[in-house]
């Protein structure tokens, strides 16, 4: 089965699969409204991978939850998100369930809490196919085995009869990837996919995702704080801070020529294996309280390049084709 078999609408021009415009997520709290995502914009084409990076509380996961219709009950959403030319924000529940089943899938951070501990893994995989694809039990079993084989699960047929607690963390994550891909989605959202895994298993999972992306032409949104993960798989990078876009561009550009002080700080904080004894760098201070954001640029209190003009909010502007940033500091002074 190919991805084209699940398409229900014609793609947008230039093969744009997902287009997000002015996405805004606000939560009502006893202390006031909290804006977790503030006017986010990006596009994603079939087969592309977008990395959304930033510290905890930057709005990465809430962006994904908004697209999936999984916000908490006190959340409100604004803006627009079109998938295959169709607006998907605030869809009726039935249409949203169909979309999530057949076209968009999400892998959550902790596979142990995402899998039902009382059901065999095979039953959980088969349930997806029987419910959403109308397969018989026998057909669903064989297709589930094929997908476990596709994600390099050893002894896949035997593993179908096992419970989640009998798997290692890396194997459980492979099960979640297999489950997410069963319906051949056009878009896969991975939220902190490798956080709980050791470095060796992380590398295996990243290699696997790259292979599956090529095989199924699936677009991926990779939500992570691990810049190594982004470097290994992503085509484009969106750097978020306090719910806003700080920088956006091709991954190689953001990594080799970052043009926002926050992006530079994140990259400088990555430990280097080629500099033995080098000082470990950090970004001073803490992420802001979203109820009491600083005036102007939210990164200003922590920024080594802060100027008086930073008391005003910098607009997100293009400074070269395909690259955006929100900063008053001249680009040439940061390179």
Task: Walk through the language-model features, giving the residues of each.
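A short, flexible loop at the N-terminus of ABC-type nucleotide-binding domains that lies
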Residues: 13-17, 26-39, 70-76, 92-95, ...
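Short catalytic/signature loops enriched in Gly
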Residues: 13-16, 154-158, 248-335
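P-loop NTP-binding/switch modules centered on Walker-like glycine-rich loops
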Residues: 69-70, 189-193, 197-278
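ABC ATPase NBD coupling module
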Residues: 74, 88-105, 123, 131, ...
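Conserved ABC transporter NBD signature motif
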Residues: 76-87
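Conserved ABC ATPase "signature" region
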Residues: 87, 139-158, 267
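A short, proline-enriched helix->beta-strand linker immediately N-terminal to the Walker B motif
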Residues: 182-186
């Amino acid at each position: 089965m190919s991805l084209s078999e699940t398409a229900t609408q014609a793609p947008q021009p230039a093969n744009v699969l997902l287009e997000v415009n002015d996405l805004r997520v606000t939560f009502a709290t006893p202390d006031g409204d909290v804006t977790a995502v503030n006017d986010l914009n990006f596009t994603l084409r079939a087969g592309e991978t977008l990395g959304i990076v930033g510290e905890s509380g930057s709005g990465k996961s809430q962006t994904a939850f908004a697209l999936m219709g999984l916000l908490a009950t006190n959340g409100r959403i604004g803006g627009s998100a079109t998938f295959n030319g169709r607006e998907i924000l605030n869809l009726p529940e039935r249409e949203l369930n169909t979309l999530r089943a057949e076209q968009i899938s999400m892998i959550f951070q902790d596979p142990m809490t995402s899998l039902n501990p009382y059901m065999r893994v095979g039953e959980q995989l088969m349930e997806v196919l029987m419910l959403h694809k109308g397969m018989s039990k026998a057909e669903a079993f064989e297709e589930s085995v094929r997908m476990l084989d596709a994600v390099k699960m050893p002894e896949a047929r035997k593993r179908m009869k096992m419970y989640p607690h009998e798997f290692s963390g890396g194997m459980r994550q492979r099960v979640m990837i297999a489950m997410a891909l069963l319906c051949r989605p056009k878009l896969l959202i991975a939220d902190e996919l490798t956080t709980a895994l050791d470095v060796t298993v992380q590398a295996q999972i990243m290699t696997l995702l790259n292979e599956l992306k090529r095989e199924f032409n699936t677009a991926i949104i990779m939500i992570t704080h691990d810049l190594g993960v982004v470097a290994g798989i992503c085509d484009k990078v969106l750097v978020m801070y306090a719910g806003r876009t700080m920088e956006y561009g091709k991954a190689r550009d953001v990594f080799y020529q970052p043009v926002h002080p926050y992006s530079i700080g994140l990259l400088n904080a990555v430990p280097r294996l080629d500099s033995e004894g080098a000082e470990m760098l950090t970004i001073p201070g803490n992420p802001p309280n979203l109820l009491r954001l600083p005036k102007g640029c939210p990164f200003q209190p922590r920024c080594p390049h802060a100027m008086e003009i930073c008391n005003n909010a910098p607009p997100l502007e293009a400074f070269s084709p395909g690259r955006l940033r929100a900063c008053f500091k001249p680009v040439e002074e940061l390179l």
